[in-house]
Amino acid sequence: MKRILFVFGLMMLTVSMASAQQKEASIAVLESEVHDFGDIDAKAGPVTHTFKIKNEGEVALVVTKVVASCGCTSPDWTKEPIASGKTGEIKVTFNPENRPGPFTKTVSVYSNGKTGSYVLTIKGNVTTN
């Protein structure tokens, strides 16, 4: 009888711990997922936009990887964990050199957040005046 109660108690403890862990999650909220640079002069050099990412979850948000869709686009991001209620940054730089005309580029963001991944988009038009 003691053995049955012990096993039952252990099972209940495991279930309660599992449900408590499910409640704790990082929730990444982005101010925007798309940025339009408008017209960019190719001779002006690279342009940068900073996307803000806020952690509205209970545990620290960690952006684990950020991948650009093209070599003309380079990302930089907050590497340290983003505490609950705090905001981090994902800076995306586009180099318009030798790329005249309209463009749309994406950056994939991976994290420990509830959603897991996001796609950010930058777009614009490179002019050669």
Identify the meaning behind each predicted range.
Residues 35, 86-92:
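Short strand-edge motifs at loop-to-beta-strand transitions and within beta-strands
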Residues 100-128:
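Terminal connector regions
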Residues 59-66, 119-120:
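Short, hydrophobic/aromatic beta-strand segments
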Residues 44-50, 99-106:
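Short, solvent-exposed loop/turn segments enriched in Ser/Thr/Gly
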